[in-house]
């Protein structure tokens, strides 16, 4: 209920945060100024700015097989084993990569134009067929499946990150974020849209009580 403002040391946009192995990593940047931002903290109070070797804005960060991977604008992918030293990787795309998740021994990143790329090591990336040209934004992995959300009411699912299935959502608005909690997938989007599913395949609309756009959800 009570929040305390901490000094991050930056005025740049911060897009995402992750906590693994006693370390907090938050990422972001400034799109128009070509500025990339990575901050690292062990306690959430004191933050250290990290040099990444990229000037692209970063949108999302995931952790798997003992490494952090962050994705961003113009197909940017950077990896790190400790959150301090980062290496630029070739993603094979120049599209914006809005989301990344790790599951079933594979990293999956999604972005503009229906872009989906996957990698088993975070170094070598392969383009996958999504079946849509809509931009893709949200991604989560639970119950042995990846679930991806995007524009035009898009929800896609995959068990392996390679083969993707389109699901009927009953809406055409952008679905921006997704999470998994208490045996239910919950997706949120524009115009106050909330959708739920027990399996990622069949979706039901719920009343949110707002018509405002919902950008993200976490549990």
Stretches found by the model and what they are:
Residues 1-219:
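Residue-level hotspots at or immediately adjacent to binding/recognition sites across diverse folds
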């Amino acid at each position: 209920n009570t929040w305390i403002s901490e000094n991050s040391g930056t005025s740049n946009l911060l897009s995402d945060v992750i906590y693994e192995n006693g370390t907090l990593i938050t990422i972001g940047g400034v799109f128009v100024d070509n500025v990339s931002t990575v901050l690292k903290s062990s306690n959430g109070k004191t933050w250290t700015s990290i040099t990444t070797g990229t000037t692209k804005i970063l949108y999302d960060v995931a952790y798997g097989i003992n490494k952090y991977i962050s994705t961003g604008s113009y197909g940017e992918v950077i990896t790190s084993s400790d959150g301090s030293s980062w290496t630029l990787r070739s993603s094979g795309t120049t599209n914006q990569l809005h989301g990344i998740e790790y599951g079933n021994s594979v990293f999956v990143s999604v972005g503009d134009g229906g872009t989906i790329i996957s990698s088993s090591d975070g170094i070598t990336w392969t383009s996958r067929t999504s079946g849509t040209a809509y931009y893709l934004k949200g991604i989560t992995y639970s119950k042995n499946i990846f679930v991806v959300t995007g524009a035009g009411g898009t929800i896609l699912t995959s068990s392996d990150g390679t083969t993707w299935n389109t699901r009927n959502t009953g809406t055409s608005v952008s679905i921006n974020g997704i999470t998994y909690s208490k045996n239910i997938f919950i997706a949120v989007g524009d115009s106050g849209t909330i959708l739920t599913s027990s399996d990622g395949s069949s979706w039901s609309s719920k009343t949110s009580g707002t018509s405002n756009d919902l950008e993200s959800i976490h549990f």
